[in-house]
Amino acid sequence: MKAIKFFLGLFMFLLTLGLIAGAGGLYWASKEIRKPGSFDSSIDIIIAPGTGVGGIAEQLQYAGAIDSPMLFRLAGRYTGQDSKLKAGEYEIPPGASILDILNLFESGRTVQRTVTIREGLTNFEIHQLLAGMKDLRQVEPEMKPEGAYLPETYNYTREESNGDILSRMEIAMQSAMDELWSKRSPDLPFKSKEEALVLASIVEKETGLPDERARVAGVFINRLKQGIALQSDPTVIYALTLGEHENEGQGPLGRRLLKKDLEYDSPYNTYKNAGLPPGPIANPGRASLEAVLNPEKHDYLFFVADGSGGHVFARTLREHNINVAKWRSVRAQKSE
């Protein structure tokens, strides 16, 4: 009987010691996973899809973000986060604790990079821009019809490809066109989104001034309604670069447009062909789409550069010729 009491007492003593030790261990571990890290600058780390908590712990130790992979694994198991860590590129802030890192990886707040595609670029120019970005995976994207992409600032992660961004740009353009088309002015001289996109691309290339877009669009709308050729220089430039680069270049002409260029034989040349060209000449931004679908109402039929980055508008050819003469005088003075 005494032996039973002895062993029962010993068991209870050891159990108590174990509980105390366990509680002490939990208390220690709880403090350790909350203790600030010993690194004083941010650490960039990429977690590949399918990487387990053990592999992540080793990456973190190698990068200098943690000292003990085992403690990281135990912390992940203890908090239940070990199966919730998301792949991606992360920036770990200076002094982050193990718990901070687990919370970051569970949140999926990956590093967001941005690329700005400016308005008026051609598809080819956009493809070239994205192809030069070293932090994007590069694939061979399909060349979409001109004007398929909406110029904007796009977020991306290092795991994404140039094709992923192009796909988002294409979806964004379709979405913008659907939205703006439903709010269009009722008396436009065209009946399809495709035609609106063509004219928006011309407006985009004609002016970079926000307060001029609707007025320039109004000029082209008036000319279309009256059956007057658009006579837009950017359409000729597009025709020239399209031909000179064998349907691939579609960038800047690299020289001043000459009078003889206005006779260039191309369906895109709006000096030789009435109405709209067969397709867009660039990728217009949202503002140009809005301008074309809700143009300024006026009776202007002409415009020419004013020498200060904007344009001067005219109702008659006589008035326009006077403005052209003034522009040529300004240009001559600048070239002296």
Positions of predicted regions on the chain:
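Signal peptide-directed extracytoplasmic domains
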Residues: 22-182
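N-terminal short leaders/motifs
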Residues: 2-3, 44-48, 63-64, 247-248, ...
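N-terminal start-of-chain detector that recognizes signal peptides
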Residues: 15-20, 63-64, 87-89, 272-277, ...
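N-terminal Sec-pathway targeting helices
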Residues: 1-17
